[in-house]
Amino acid sequence: SDHGYHLGEHDLWQKVSIHEESAKVPLIICVPGKKPAVCHSLAELIDLYPTVSKLCGLKIPGNIQGKDISGMLDDPAVKVRDAALSSGKGRLLRTEKWALLDYGKKGELYDMENDPKQYDNLFEKSEYADTLARLKAKLKAKLVEIGKNDLNLNKL
């Protein structure tokens, strides 16, 4: 599936943000012999390669960044990731509870359990400073992890 589409939410139109309406992508996997289920675990599109490889009985290379999410097909409660990253006009770090939208020096922070429509920006509220610092550190670690791969793009 493609990304979502804004229809005026957050004063935005079309696909121009990293808010939930635009960044969340439905994923449907149909595997012969597996019962239908709905999973709510976080995943990234980069997880499709190792997942399809595993389902086809192929060896998954150890140096890829995606994670095999096929375990969710047997147990919908399986959690593969504690956070997922999206990027566009900024970066989104999404955990089950939090959404950090990072635009460099500015940003947005939302409690997705209590504010799933992302209306109450907590980014500059002092009582969320520890949560914000923890999520920023997690985002930085994720970006470092992404940068450490065997792809030498300078040779392309």
Model-derived features: positions:
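A small-molecule sensor/coupling module
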Residues: K138
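Short acidic, glycine/proline-rich loop/turn micro-motifs
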Residues: H10-L12, N121-L122
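Extended hydrophobic/aromatic segments used for targeting, binding, or gating
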Residues: L12-S22, L27
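Active-site-proximal N-terminal segment of extracellular/periplasmic enzymes that hydrolyze or transfer
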Residues: D120-Y128
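C-terminal cap/loop subdomain of S1 sulfatases and analogous C-terminal strand-loop tails that border
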Residues: H3-E9, C30, K35, E44-E113, ...
